[in-house]
Regions:
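Divalent-metal coordination cores built from histidine and acidic residues
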Residues: 1-135
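Active-site gating loops and adjacent loop-to-helix segments of metal-dependent hydrolytic enzymes
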Residues: 1-3, 11-34, 43-56, 125, ...
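Short, electropositive alpha-helical surface patch
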Residues: 21, 26, 34-49, 76-80, ...
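Divalent metal-coordination and catalytic microenvironments
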Residues: 57, 102, 131, 177, ...
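Histidine/acidic residue-rich metal-binding segments in metalloenzymes
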Residues: 72-251, 331, 353
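His/Asp/Glu-enriched, well-ordered alpha-helical/loop segment
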Residues: 148-176, 223, 244, 250, ...
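A conserved acidic, glycine/proline-rich C-terminal tail/linker
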Residues: 379-399
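Generic C-terminus detector
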Residues: 393-417
């Protein structure tokens, strides 16, 4: 390969339901996507801790009971799962799958419980992951496309209102607020100003917001329906600008599997969301790196290092595991230089050859890596996904960059090598 990269692997947001068994489909698609650590939004903590999967996962506690928005969840019900609280009494599973955040993802925290939720965040030393949008009507972005489709629109200020409200809450309380799947230029500008002020604000966006505008609805139909909705082309460009200037701290998939039957119900009835795990790196690399907006290294920071640090994990230090490696000179066993000739005929990587040596780390159980071929061109084929879902607008896309292998705890868990 002309450009093989090694990165520590993690992902901050995998929305899902309870799964079980080491061969669970969800586990396969996580590994295929080049990720090993995810946040899953589940309320059944005891059940979740018993699930055995070949991936690492953290838990996110619901901000409200039953995620209904009427009453804040009770700290007494879940504090024992938070790192730093009653650690001596924790089971190994509880230590392995900690609660690292609070969220009502899918909905913004409602005004009537916001203050109590912020108190819970402070009491547990966690952070608030906020779905920064609130609206009661509408199905797609409000604008020319919604009018052409004859579908009720969602104004862009539905996102800004929650962003502005929660920035003020962070200013008032000192609570760390992390905004999910930000999609509008006006929200990015508000976040940019808040960060310049030194407030504890971070944010993410998703591959579809940097790759698609609401015009994709005309081509892909409900496969491009999501929440927040795809916005205007100007907002898409503003999303890329926010990634390039560092306003965006990380990229997440906002992975939301649905059946094609559900997606065929039409714009008003079809569920929001697309699957994103298995083509996330390729789509982001194609748009951001091939487009000249960021480097390969920065994309790794956005998809790996940043998410790990947000969740309170220390990413594997790849630099500590590599050493310069010199090709051996031809020996008497190759008097005609045949081996050397074959070697010289192979594509040569730029820069210094390096050897990855997992024996150089004392705690091999915590070595989590992904091998990436950043130069591989491939076509997204949903029929080849490990996921049972096929709801993606990226089918048929030509992208570059693909995970070749996923290593968890120094063990090869998935490989295309």
């Amino acid at each position: 390969y002309t450009n093989v990269l090694i990165m520590p692997n993690t992902l901050p947001a995998l929305d899902g339901q309870t799964v079980s068994g080491p061969e669970a489909t969800g586990a396969k698609e996580v590994l295929d996507a080049g990720f090993d650590n995810v946040i899953d939004f589940l309320q059944q903590y005891d059940t979740a801790h018993d699930v055995q999967l070949p991936v690492r996962y953290d838990l996110c506690v619901c901000a409200s009971k039953d995620r209904a928005g009427h009453e804040a969840s009770d700290v007494a019900d879940w504090l024992k799962y938070v790192p730093g609280f009653e650690d001596d009494a924790k089971t190994p599973a509880m230590l392995t799958h900690p609660i690292t955040a609070i969220s009502d993802d899918g909905s913004a925290v409602t005004p009537e419980i916001l203050d109590q939720v912020l108190e819970n965040v402070k009491a547990s030393d966690l952070y608030l992951i906020e779905h920064c949008e609130h609206h009661d009507t509408g199905a797609v972005n409000e604008g020319p496309v919604s009018r052409e489709l004859g579908v009720p629109g969602i104004p862009e200020d539905t996102e800004l209102k929650i962003v502005a409200r929660d920035i003020e809450a962070a200013r008032r309380t000192g609570v760390h607020v992390h905004f999910q799947h930000v999609s509008t230029a006006i929200s990015f500008e508000a976040i940019r100003r808040a960060k310049a002020e030194g407030l504890p604000i971070t944010c993410e966006t998703a591959p579809h917001y940097l790759a698609l505008s609401d015009e994709a609805l005309l081509k892909y139909g409900t496969l491009a329906k999501m929440n927040p909705p795809l916005r205007s082309e100007a907002d898409r460009k503003a999303t890329i600008a926010a990634i390039a200037d560092g306003t965006v701290d990380l990229l997440a998939t906002d992975h939301a599997p649905h059946t094609l039957a559900e997606k065929e119900l039409g714009f008003l009835e079809a569920p929001n969301g697309i699957i994103g795990l298995e083509c996330a790196y390729g789509v982001c690399h194609k748009v951001l790196v091939d487009g000249g907006f960021i480097s390969d290294e920065r994309l790794i920071e956005l998809m790996s290092v940043g998410p790990a640090e947000l969740m309170g994990h220390v990413p594997t230090d790849v630099a500590a595991l590599v050493e310069d490696y010199a090709e051996p000179a031809p020996t008497g066993d190759d008097p005609d230089g045949v081996i050397a000739g074959e070697r010289d005929a192979q594509p040569q990587r730029e820069g210094v050859n390096r050897l990855l040596d997992l024996s150089r780390v004392d705690d091999a159980d915590n070595v989590d890596l992904v091998v990436l071929n950043a130069a591989e061109e491939w076509t997204v084929d949903p029929e080849q996904f490990h996921s049972k879902a096929r709801n993606t607008p990226f089918g048929g896309w030509q992208v570059t960059g693909r995970p070749l292998a996923t290593i968890i705890g120094s063990q090869l868990m998935f490989s295309r090598l």
